[in-house]
Amino acid sequence: MAEFVRAQIFGTTFEITSRYTDLQPVGMGAFGLVCSAKDQLTNQAVAVKKIMKPFSTPVLSKRTYRELKLLKHLRHENIISLSDIFISPLEDIYFVTELLGTDLHRLLTSRPLEKQFIQYFLYQILRGLKYVHSAGVVHRDLKPSNILVNENCDLKICDFGLARIQDPQMTGYVSTRYYRAPEIMLTWQKYDVEVDIWSAGCIFAEMLEGKPLFPGKDHVNQFSIITELLGTPPDDVIQTICSENTLRFVQSLPKRERQPLANKFKNAEPDAVDLLENMLVFDPRKRVRAEQALAHPYLAPYHDPTDEPVADEKFDWSFNDADLPVDTWKIMMYSEILDYHNVDAAVPEQENNGS
């Protein structure tokens, strides 16, 4: 039986196994507090994420289960990887992952990025997205703060708590506004992997300029800023809006012409602007895919089609439509954690049945 120790971090109790020491707060991730720690077993620095009250509601339970399943399934150099997971005696869940020194948000607010770093970071983002999308997963919340970077400029995408299946009828309020694709913001009829490409395009633009490309104060202002640069959406795109209120709003706006991005990004080389033009397209059907973007001349210094893997198999989303009580999610979660640790998942159920 693992020995647990307690520590107070920002008024929050961290109850972790004695394997992890020297806890220091790093920040808030999606739905949890993250600390750095030292792994006594490997002597490596790790990130420990506490999921707050994962069994308080069915929605939270399902969200935590989804993140756990995704972290277990997604294995790629540019995706954060799970190194340990446990449930504390207080029934909080802790994900342990590798620790990277900083994130893209902190880098972008500290200094301008040189061209080779912009290229290498964008390449790694798209390499990760190619893999994620091939697994049938859409991240949905890609932004600089959940793109982690270490001192070797290795980049890893994290925070898959909001990730969803590729679903023709996706709806909902997700990503941080500045990086949110118009089809999410305006409740388009459907959205898919292309929303991540839009977000990656916004991040690319921010790396080039040193500031957010579309810093909207609210949804209306956000859409207005986008149309100032990219023009009014084409009619066939507008017709896919399923909310009547949104449709009326878009149709009421003055017609605007798309501005050449070369005018906006005067210091960027033509190849960079061309790739950005292909990423920031209103019509998701015409937006470049990750695999195509990787082959763009701008990324030629890093592109290697033999080293840009896809997932071995699609992620199993069968649980995602399930409307289950907390206790059922809890049993499923325990089963996944035991499976991760290669323990026979039937044991606790038999014990429960016998008690």
Swiss-Prot record:
Start and end residues of each Protein kinase domain: 20-299
Protein name (record): Mitogen-activated protein kinase HOG1
Cofactors, names only: Mg(2+)
GO MF annotation list: ATP binding; MAP kinase activity; protein serine kinase activity
Cellular compartment(s): Cytoplasm; Nucleus
Residues recorded as bearing Phosphothreonine in the entry: 171
Keyword Oxidoreductase: no
Keyword Transcription regulation annotated: yes
SUPFAM superfamilies on file: Protein kinase-like (PK-like)
